[in-house]
Amino acid sequence: MYSGLIDLPWWGYVLTTLALTHITIAAVTIFLHRHQAHRALELHAIPSHFFRFWLWLSTGTVTKEWASIHRKHHAKCETAEDPHSPVILGIKKVLLEGAELYRKEAKNPETLEKYGRGTPDDWIERNLYTRHSLLGIAIMLAIDVVLFGPIGLTIWAVQMAWIPINAAGI
């Protein structure tokens, strides 16, 4: 059976998956949350772009959308205008439909215009990361399957589920 370019023991696949998801969590926490949304941390261009690229591959997240929605959440916290308020919408909806709430608010041009200032607006952001946000996820699937064989599909599925599940506070 084809095992991919990298053949690991079962625990190697587990550790690899945990390492990949850890990079994603770090990218969300350091880059999106601290650096982009709150401007509490300055990053050099190299780690900043690494995180943008990694998030494109592992989540399809558009930086301006994420930062805008998070900033609006803080500006309108626990009001009817909060894009993902558990007080207004209910904890069950926020936990189970958080990604859908994100996608809905990302379609609001007023949110992006008002709260998206200072986010990357270069050629690669406009022409690749934003325009083809789902392409990164497809490339990650191909990479996982080529490197790890059929188990790569499971690794990819865990990567795709990681942020929607863990970003809800679990």
Per-segment meaning from a language model:
Residues 1-170:
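Non-catalytic, topology-defining segments of multipass membrane proteins
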